[in-house]
């Protein structure tokens, strides 16, 4: 009997064949060609910690047909699932299991760094922090509202601020704003979003630090020149208005209802 005959008679266990097929399938799933929109989505999710299909659809996929019907939600959901299947994203259920949130992985960060060498990106969170999830999700909603109103043309998140140098002098990482936003006219504003009432001393200290920072950087055209507080509680609004006092021209303090009400209220 020749060697070919011997080989043809070799039997492979069914379990081994199944395992090979499974690995081949997984390898095939990881083969994905990233588009510019994919990179934008990954960076957006890195910046904001996480996002659901709703937010990704609204920012990147939403289109209106000739009858005025919104389209694109199915494609947004499908693409997020594909990105998760290729290990660029992970997901988890949140808010009583009613919503799936996607967050970026190290593979997403590596892909972004490869396309944009030298650019500082936020680090992957690795998970979703239950202590800040409500604040983070409402901040995500607030960002979309401000962008859709045309009030914001660029958003620099606190997560990105913390990996860049120079912005936190006099403020300190613990007092970093939630974002630095750029307006149509090129001016910049530090954005603070408050969902809970904090100690008066913290508001007083933060106002003091902001005033010092703005004064120190008044000759820097790239620096923010005002601070915009969006708050959930009238009590917080009163405290901030009190401590901003004579510096009120540097601060804009508003209740969140005027913004988040346009995004289906403040519910998650």
Q: What label would you give each PLM region?
A:
Residues 195-246:
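Catalytic cores of nucleic-acid endonucleases
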Residues 246-268:
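Charged, structured surface patches that assemble and position nucleic-acid processing machinery
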């Amino acid at each position: 009997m020749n060697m070919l005959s011997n080989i043809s008679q070799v039997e492979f266990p069914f379990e081994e064949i199944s395992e090979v097929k499974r690995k081949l399938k997984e390898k095939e799933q990881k083969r994905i060609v990233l588009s510019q929109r994919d990179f934008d989505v990954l960076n957006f999710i890195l910046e904001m910690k996480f996002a659901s299909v709703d937010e990704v659809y609204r920012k990147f996929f939403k289109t209106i047909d000739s009858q005025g019907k919104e389209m694109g939600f199915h494609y947004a959901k499908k693409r997020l699932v594909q990105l998760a299947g290729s290990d660029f994203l992970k997901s988890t259920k949140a808010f009583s299991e009613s919503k799936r949130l996607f967050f970026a992985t190290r593979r997403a960060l590596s892909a972004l760094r490869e396309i944009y060498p030298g650019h500082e990106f936020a680090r992957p969170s690795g998970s979703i922090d239950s202590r800040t999830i409500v604040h983070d999700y409402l901040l995500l909603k607030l960002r979309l509202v401000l962008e859709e109103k045309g009030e914001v043309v660029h958003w620099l998140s606190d997560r990105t601020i913390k990996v860049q140098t120079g912005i936190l002098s006099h403020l300190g990482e613990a007092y970093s704003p939630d974002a630095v936003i750029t307006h149509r006219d090129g001016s910049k504003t530090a954005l603070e979003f408050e969902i809970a009432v904090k100690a008066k001393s913290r508001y007083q200290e933060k106002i003091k630090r902001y005033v010092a920072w703005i004064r120190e950087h008044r000759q820097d055209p790239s620096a923010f020149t005002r601070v915009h507080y969006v708050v959930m509680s009238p009590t917080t609004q009163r405290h901030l208005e009190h401590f901003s006092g004579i510096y009120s021209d540097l601060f804009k303090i508003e209740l969140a209802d005027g913004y988040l009400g346009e995004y289906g209220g403040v519910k998650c």
